[in-house]
């Protein structure tokens, strides 16, 4: 808890641990399992690892950026929930959802990979939510879709998600690079979040996106 308190004070966010997450977790559209269901040692190690990743990730943002999610009265803002599991069809290890005053970000403490990337990915979702809450026209669909391959449809619109489809991604040696990976083709929001995730923590790979004639 002390490690979380330091991050709260330093970055102007709220961090909930274990059973503290119960009320906020119930607001998510995904079923969330709290970390107090885990073995005590595994919970402690997982929470410590994610808090360390959060510290490294938060340091990448301009000073005061994360605190700007608070409202004009200085209330609400970014609230992180460190949990045991997020139940979804896509195997997500983080999810973001909002209320009038809070942007909630749940992070799976059992996921031992891409921790910093996941934090930055979810912070972008919260950022996009915040932007749209202030100006719902901020992202022009036609302008964005014009950057995609001709005739492309995101999978959440077609209902046909294939996690192994590497076409137009950085992992395909064929056509131009339009997307980071197959998950970026799930939804426009995931596309943007994947790009921001790679710009923040995967500098070398992000260079491939920047250099691509397609993008």
In which residue ranges do the predicted regions lie?
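Non-catalytic architectural context of zinc metalloproteases
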Residues: 1-52, 85, 156-168, 172, ...
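Generic detector of well-ordered alpha-helical segments enriched in charged/polar residues
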Residues: 5-8, 48-58, 66-70, 145, ...
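Auxiliary, metal-adjacent structural segments of Zn-dependent hydrolase domains
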Residues: 31-99
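Active-site-flanking segments in enzyme catalytic domains
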Residues: 73-215
């Amino acid at each position: 808890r002390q490690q979380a308190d330091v991050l709260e004070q330093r970055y102007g966010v709220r961090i909930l641990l274990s059973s503290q997450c119960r009320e906020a977790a119930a607001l998510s559209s995904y079923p969330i399992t709290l970390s107090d269901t885990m073995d005590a040692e595994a919970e402690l190690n997982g929470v410590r690892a994610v808090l360390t990743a959060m510290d490294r990730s938060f340091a990448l943002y301009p000073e005061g950026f994360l605190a700007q999610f608070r409202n004009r009265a200085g209330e609400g803002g970014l609230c992180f929930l460190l949990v045991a599991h997020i139940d979804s069809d896509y195997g997500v290890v983080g999810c973001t959802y909002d209320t009038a005053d809070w942007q909630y970000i749940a992070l799976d403490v059992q996921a031992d990979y891409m921790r910093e990337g996941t934090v930055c990915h979810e912070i972008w979702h919260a950022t996009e939510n915040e932007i749209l809450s202030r100006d719902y026209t901020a992202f022009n669909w036609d302008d964005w879709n014009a950057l995609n391959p001709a005739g492309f449809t995101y999978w959440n619109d077609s209902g046909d998600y294939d996690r192994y489809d590497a076409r137009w991604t950085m992992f395909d040696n064929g056509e131009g690079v339009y997307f980071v990976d197959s998950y970026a083709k799930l939804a426009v929001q995931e596309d943007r979040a994947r790009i921001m995730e790679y710009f923040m923590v995967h500098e070398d790979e992000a260079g491939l996106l920047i250099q691509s004639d397609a993008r």
